[in-house]
Amino acid sequence: MSAKSIELTSGKGGLPVVKVRTPWSEAEIYLNGAHVTHFQKSGEPPLIFVSAKSQFAAGKAIRGGVPICFPWFGNRAGEPSHGFARTAAWQLVKSAVAPDGEVTLRFALPQLPGREAWSCLRTEFSVTVSETLTLGLTTANDSCDSAIEIENCLHTYFNVGDIGAVSLTGLQGTAFLDNAAGGNGARKIQEAAALRIPRETNRIYLDTISAVEIRDESLKRIIRVEKTGSHSTVVWNPWTTQKLPNDFDPAEHQRMVCVESGNVGPNKLSLAPGKSATLQVAVSSRAG
């Protein structure tokens, strides 16, 4: 590894973290969950939000950043929410620095005790840091006897100045499942060109490959989320009404919004033997 560009060190809670510096930006990725917790371009506020109350402990989920939801999304009886990948100890298997200073890291999800049903899958996560943050989650059915169903999602928490001054575009005309309190999972259509967040919001947008832009009037910034290999977009803000663990201060809802890219619910994937699927997300920003 280049000592100047990539450093594997001890982070919060004593957890191993990879710190990255490029000519344009800096980033941090914890091996616990292969969890991106920081991405900041020079001269800008951070693009990624992490709760001040988040736990940093082995085997515990980090509140904020980019949790990897896999191999399922949401709740499953008797199982951890959003799957086991986000709390597993991933392995850093490759790092590279391009001539221009761009950094690429590759992480592998190891075989885990008690997860033998998933052992025929191979899952890797790549992080490329430059002026843009590019993330890639690849799952291959290397040795399963038959097709296996999975859900995947990069559950990105974005840092905003004031949620009341934020609007999201790119979802007009798209069907979504309303999972907020009182929504009862009803299927609805996004009618407005711009989505505002004035209350608890939990929507799974279906059959969409569109980019989403987050216009932040407070920070005078536009964050663009582009994706490939994804047919679902999730927009989430818990407001003060959704009950969460004590790793999130309800007041923090003012400074974050999740725009998540993946394949969940009706858009879940079926991987036949010998097939693979890659979910890729590119995050960029500009003044606006």
Model-inferred region functions:
Residues 1-63, 210-230, 273-288:
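Beta-strand-rich N-terminal accessory domains
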Residues 29, 137-144, 285:
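Asparagine-centered strand-capping/turn motif at beta-strand->loop junctions
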Residues 38-40, 145-152:
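Short, hydrophobic/aromatic beta-strand segments
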Residues 58, 124-126, 266-271:
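Beta-strand-rich interaction surfaces with strong enrichment in secreted/lumenal proteins
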Residues 69, 216-257:
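Glycine-rich active-site loops that engage anionic ligands at enzyme catalytic sites
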Residues 80-130:
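Extended, loop-rich substrate-binding clefts of extracytoplasmic carbohydrate-active enzymes
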Residues 145-149, 157-232:
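Active-site/ligand-binding surface loops and adjacent short beta/alpha elements
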Residues 255-265:
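Short, structured beta-strand/loop micro-motifs enriched in basic residues and often containing a Trp
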